Amino acid sequence: MFLKKEKFNWQTESLTIFELSALQRIEYITFMTTEEKTVSADSDGISDQEMTARLIGSNIRCGARLIAMSLWHNDPAGTDVETLYQQVLSGWPPEAIGKAEMQIKLLSGMLVPVDDDNAADPDASAEAKSAEPVSAEKPLPAS
């Protein structure tokens, strides 16, 4: 198989996650589109609390779907994505769903890794140290 994989750890549990295939990415985008339509349906007359609840639920469902699609690669002949999705929703805490979602998106190239303080580019930090300080004040005329 050509798909990248890595270990996902949550507390004392560990499992293998996979990047999404091209077809799964298309299916995931379609799922997200349906979720967005559900969240925005009849949104004009609802309270802020109702909208917040809809958005949180949608975020959790989208994360659980992504995880289910990834986990499916552990045994393609076994449990289907829909069953895995329901298992993730009913058995995983929201924090674990969020962490796994981010890890799968990074693995799948759906998010760009963030460099910590330009650690990968030592020239950038050297330039920042030698640069003149930035100020909102107008420069004084030379005398």
Language-model features: locations:
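Short acidic-hydrophobic surface loop/beta-edge motif
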Residues: 4-12
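Short, isolated positions in well-ordered beta-strands
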Residues: 13-17
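Short, surface-exposed, charged amphipathic helix/loop patches that serve as local interaction elements
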Residues: 2-3, 18-143
